[in-house]
Design a protein with these regions (language model features):
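N-terminal pre-domain/capping segments
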Residues: 2-145, 166-173, 180, 217, ...
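Short aromatic-enriched loop/helix-cap "lid" or pocket-rim segments at secondary-structure transitions
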Residues: 49-50, 158-160, 208, 235, ...
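Short helix-capping segments at alpha-helix termini
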Residues: 28, 103-104, 185-191, 214-219, ...
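Hydrophobic faces of well-ordered beta-strands that scaffold small-molecule active sites
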Residues: 33-38, 74-76, 107-112, 146-148, ...
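Acidic/histidine-rich catalytic cores of soluble enzymes
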Residues: 172, 176-271
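Acidic-and-aromatic substrate-binding clefts and catalytic sites of carbohydrate-active enzymes
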Residues: 78-91, 115-119, 154-157, 198-205, ...
């Protein structure tokens, strides 16, 4: 049974069935986990290069960093590509893919910004069109997943404020309708739409699964952000969503970027293995507000911790 068939099968099961199906798959595929770097770990330096604020770093240069640190994959996030939100030239996409291939690095995914919680239907449709464009970028890159959001993505706003009094059910219908249109397009290019929980509209694992069920497409599934479930025990939410996950964002803390409580990586890896997930585990380190942050030091250290946990749970 391949990964696609497994996911499609899970979509037909009630949640109670996941507990039976997932461990069986885990026994067969427990060793096939690969580590990837999410480009956002270098957010400031990437934006420095884009805006001409000193030397910074580019996605191309981060591929060299990945090779030096023996990452298996790289999430080439769209908003660090030249000219974003415009689509980059084919020559750039092809060059990025070729360099990754030459270095033996897989492209584990990409991602874009969107807002499907706004009451402005025109803005939502712009987001749909934008995602469709970058689905084609993902396909050209060889990325299996494009990361999108069901959350507002604005620090000063939330889904309740931008939806202008709409109910949660109404907003979920907006999001599901938009994601369904994106998934229909993505299916043509064999790219999955990955929906990441980001602590606003999607605070819990059940909220994420409910949305994915409302979309109702095998080409749309959850991305588990291990640091953005706003619940008393995020590991419960992670375990709930893990069996149907299409990708991950492994964070340093389950309690958000400003927390000093570290992720229990062996516990997390046991959840991953029990879920039957196989594929990339991208890490995303974040810069805590008001504190020094050097991704060239932080990323390799966290990578080692993740690799140790993978080995420990094999």
């Amino acid at each position: 049974m391949n990964r696609r068939t497994f996911i499609q099968g899970l979509s037909l099961l009630p949640l109670s069935g996941l507990a039976v199906a997932a461990p069986q798959a885990a026994k067969k595929k427990s060793a096939t986990l690969k580590v990837s770097l999410n480009a956002y770990s270098f957010n400031k330096l990437l934006n420095d290069a884009i805006r001409g604020r000193g030397e910074g770093v580019t996605l191309m240069q981060l591929l060299d960093f990945c090779a030096r640190n023996k990452f298996d994959g790289f999430d080439a996030t769209g908003y660090f590509m030249p000219g974003y939100p415009a689509v980059p030239p084919d020559s750039y996409i092809d060059g990025l893919r070729k360099k990754a291939a030459d270095l033996g690095i897989g492209i584990s995914g990409t991602g874009v910004r969107n807002n499907f919680t706004t009451a402005d239907a025109a803005v939502r449709q712009e987001g749909v069109n934008h995602i469709k464009q970058y689905v084609e970028v993902a396909a050209r890159l060889g990325a299996p997943v494009i990361r999108v959001f069901a959350d507002t993505q604005m620090r000063a706003e939330n889904w309740e404020s931008v939806s202008k009094g709409a109910t949660r059910a109404q907003v979920q219908d907006w999001i599901a309708t938009n994601l369904r249109e994106c998934a229909e397009h993505a299916a043509k290019f064999k790219v999955k739409i990955g929906v990441q929980n980001h602590g606003d509209f999607l605070k819990t694992g059940q909220e994420l699964l409910t949305l994915i069920k409302a979309v109702g497409s095998p080409w749309c599934g959850p991305i588990v952000d291990t640091g953005y479930f706003k619940t008393p025990d995020p590991y419960v939410d992670i375990a709930l969503v893990a069996p149907t996950s299409v990708n991950w964002q492994v964070k340093q803390s389950p309690l958000g970027e400003d927390s000093e409580v570290p992720t229990d990586l062996p516990k997390l890896l046991r959840i991953v293995r029990n879920s039957g997930y196989t594929g990339y585990l991208p890490i995303e380190t974040l810069s805590p507000r008001g504190k020094p942050y050097d991704p060239y030091a932080v990323v390799p250290a966290f990578l080692k911790e993740l690799r140790d946990a993978i080995a420990q749970t094999a």
